[in-house]
Amino acid sequence: MKKLVLSALLACSLFGADMMYSEGVKDVYADATSTKSIGRLLPTNAVKILQTSGDRVKLAVQGYQNPAVPNVVYFSDFARVIAVAFSKTANPEIKVLQKGKDGKWDKVETIVYASKDGFTSDLKGLFNKGETLYKESCGVCHGLHATTHYNANQWPSLLKSMVNRTAIQKEDQWVVIEYLQKHSSDVNVDKK
């Protein structure tokens, strides 16, 4: 009987809280019915799907927040790799899970809503897409830089300065940026 109850609890937790990744930039909302976006979730960032209601999902997003920048939740506690960014007028509920050292980089969680499409469980596939777009588009004018040639904070401005001379579509730019940042010299998720 004990095994049956534990199995049922495990199954419920797995089905009720699926870990997924955004495939592209997604608008986020304060509740299930709001039509006004309060921010954006960037691609390749993990979310826990808590509930589905109609065409919306309720998401838990964990990350790090610099208390000096209250409208951004970052992927890591040392680099500006954005997970979700809120508008300056938004007032999202952000729960501190663990206080950071010296008043910086608190581990946080926020609950937001988004359209239920555009999520995948295949993070490797998203990184492969970013890598392919980078390799096929960014080595045409110059030698291709290794992803570890720059740190996470440098990649967004470098790519944005050259992206207009590539075939990378606007909707894929953040997939490439997040791939580069998460495989940079200081973050490099493959080495963790």
Functional labels for PLM-detected ranges:
Residues 166-192:
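C-terminal capping alpha-helices of c-type cytochrome domains
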